Design a protein with these regions (language model features):
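N-terminal subdomain of nucleotide-sugar transferases
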Residues: 1-64
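A short, active-site helix/loop in glycosyltransferases that binds the activated sugar's phosphate group
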Residues: 149, 153-168
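Acceptor-binding helix/loop patch of EC 2.4 sugar-transfer enzymes
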Residues: 9, 65-72, 121-153
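An aromatic- and histidine-rich active-site surface loop
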Residues: 97-116, 122-131, 167
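An amphipathic, basic-hydrophobic alpha-helix
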Residues: 67-96, 107, 146, 150, ...
Length: 168
């Protein structure tokens, strides 16, 4: 049986388009006979147990509290998620790592995928740097935009496969 470990920003029971899409993907994989689980990063918004099952889906939570200013805070988030992934991979023994945007998840997953020889799929749902420009919280000529774009490009190049939700 194929075992897929999803690396997520957040998940159910939080309610968002992101969590509903994740649920649909995981349920479709289960319908194919695959064993699936998820790991959420430190940005998951709800308190709860370290391992939570919701709607038949199991999620491992990264409970580390990360502080500091950008960009050190983001690197600490990647480190915390990598440490949690290391623990979960040892226990769960996945055949595939399926990392979902944002890029911080892909950076953490890449470390573990390379260390353990596990194929990595990176699913890009949006370029978060472009979304920041679109909603007025960032600019295209900013340092943060350029670094995020560089990290996205690196993540795509290092992944074994990439999935996108549109061609636009």
């Amino acid at each position: 049986m194929t075992r897929v470990l999803h690396i997520l920003d957040h998940s159910l029971p939080a309610q968002s388009g992101y969590t509903f899409r994740t649920r649909a993907i995981m349920k479709a994989q289960m319908a194919m006979g695959w064993d699936v689980a998820g790991v959420t990063g430190v940005r998951h918004p709800l308190d709860g147990p370290d391992v939570e099952t919701y709607d038949g889906l199991t999620f491992y939570r990264t409970k580390t509290v990360v502080s500091g200013r950008s960009p050190l805070k983001e690197w600490r988030e990647v480190g915390a998620l990598s440490a949690q992934l290391e623990r979960v991979v040892a226990q769960y023994q996945p055949d595939i790592l399926h990392s979902h945007s944002p890029v911080l998840n892909a950076l953490a997953a890449d470390r573990i995928a390379k260390r353990h020889g596990i194929p990595l799929l990176y699913e890009i749902r949006a370029f978060w740097e472009d979304a920041a420009v679109g909603n007025g919280t960032g600019t295209q000529d900013s340092f943060k935009y350029k670094v995020t774009r560089m990290l996205e490009t690196r993540a795509v190049r290092r992944a074994d496969a990439v999935a996108v939700i549109c061609e636009g």
